[in-house]
Amino acid sequence: MNTAIQAALDHAVQTLQQEGVLPSDWNNSSNLTRTKDRSHGDFASNIAMIGSKAAGMKPRDLAEKILAALPEVADISKAEIAGPGFINFFLNADQRFAILDQIQAQKESFGRSQSNVAKKIQVEFVSANPTSSLHVGHGRGAAYGMTVANLLEATGAKVDREYYVNDAGRQMDILATSTYLRYLELLGQNLVFPKNAYQGDYVKEIAQGIIDKDGDAYVREVANVYKDVPEDVQYAEELDSEGNKVVLSGDKEKHIDGLIANSQQLLGEGYRVFHQAALHAILDDIKDDLADFGVTFNQWFSEASLSAKIDEALETLDQRGFLYEKDGNIWFKSTEFGDEKDRVVKRRNGQTTYFASDIAYHLNKLQRGYTDLVDIWGSDHHGYISRVKAAIDAMGYDSKKLTVLLVQFVSLWRGGEMVQMSSRSGQFVTLRDLRKEVGNDAARFYYVMRKSEQHIDFDLDLAVSQSKDNAVYYIQYAHARICRMLEKAASTGLQFEVSAARSHAARLSLDAETEILAKLAAYPDVVLRAANAYEPHQVGNYLKELAALFHGWYNEHKVLSDDAELTQARLLLSINVQQVLRNGLELLGVSAPEAM
């Protein structure tokens, strides 16, 4: 219906342009939206307020001219001017009921569209280092990324979900060396475990797996492993005035780097055993965790596979005049594209930087023919956006193809108090822990119920409560309530048939029923807006509102009654609410239970 109204408004604009009321080059950027207040009609347009300046008249005066030029629109009973110049459109009664036919015809496809069918979009998300289990912060990125991809697919786009595996960086070397040191410990070697190594018990488990397979084949003298390694950091017993550790001596970074270098030299090809064992153990754990969470990927892209692409990317930048040498390092002229300073892409020792790998990865993405790239990063990567976009432009591509969405941190609350997010050894509360406590549905729902750049205070008590304050429970309960109602109707021998019930739809005359019909009709617009804005919370809020309307109506008015026609009409309304709730929950990755 909104398409027909918009077409009529466009026709009116063309007429007014021909009459000289509006400039011929005026671009109509107005919005046509569903009204929240039923007294304001079904749709409202701000076209007169947007065009008043160009027309040189007051918005209400322009609105009158637009109405006069507006062609007749089928199923619109009236259009009127309201407030400072809004034009409100009222549907006739039959058109309001048409949404019931549309939902029943489209079923699980209702709300989906082909609006973005021309787009091929890659959504890269989570991409956590495979060095430990996913924590609750990663969980938010997983839920958000998966739901954004779902929404884009629902609007017709071809979507690829990708996880970038950081399997070639320093953190993996720290994990591999941590595993090797635990391996030596388990085989009876005495050593002081580095403060900057990975401390978790999972490292010992990986090391034990290597022992079970290869025994003591990789044992080397501990003295040689620690030979000429700089001293590890030593801290004072007391913290400073701000609660931070006070360094007495040593350097934890240089210490672990020395251990990495010695381990690589002593083990030779054997070092890869520890590197790969650690990588695959953690990556398999991450894959299992995400799959259990309903988050899947088309591709797990290995950073280690980018070696040739890094050379290609740097050569491209060099040929285009955007690299230079200084102090033995190779620098990218990112300041020419608005970055705050130039960035090193290759160090004097010949090693390329993580940024160089990121440039190569985005070159690879662009060469795969995507119309749009969506990167979902943690909020601490905010400063990284400008340099990546600069590199894309410098290589001759359009950085506008890249959208970077930042995901803020998550705080857990229980009993009105913030939960300690990490232990003394730095182990964070894991996604698996959260899922075990509140379930997948609550986690998937509450993770996306705020804009991604907003902090989330995750109330663990609320997430498991069975009350209307728990939004996901309230929505699921509405769906289950309708299922139970249909079962009850069937058990009494009531014959319900959609086409027959449709003939009694006019009995849905209560304000509450009209409001539910309008809310159902708004669903496709909500999905499209949520997809284009990358805002899943719009769907979540819509479902909350629809569930609240249904519960309020159900509590006040009997659905199964002695009035056969009214019963049929209300059952028809209910099954349409049920369908839309199910469709929306599916987009959010939340189940629609039939009983609760």
UniProtKB/Swiss-Prot annotation:
Tell me where it resides.
Answer: Cytoplasm
Q: Does the keyword Mitochondrion apply?
A: no
Q: Which E.C. number(s) belong to this protein?
A: 6.1.1.19
* Cellular component aspect of the GO annotation: cytoplasm
State one molecular function term (GO): ATP binding
Q: Where is this motif: 'HIGH' region?
A: 128-138
TM spans (from-to): none
Q: Which InterPro entries match?
A: Arg-tRNA-ligase (IPR001278), Arg-tRNA-synth_N (IPR005148), Arg-tRNA-synth_N_sf (IPR036695), ArgRS_core (IPR035684), DALR_anticod-bd (IPR008909), Rossmann-like_a/b/a_fold (IPR014729), tRNAsynth_Ia_anticodon-bd (IPR009080)
The subunit structure is:
Monomer.
User: What family does the entry list?
Assistant: Belongs to the class-I aminoacyl-tRNA synthetase family.
Tell me what this protein is called.
Arginine--tRNA ligase
**Source species, please?**
Acinetobacter baumannii (strain SDF)
Tell me what gene encodes this: argS
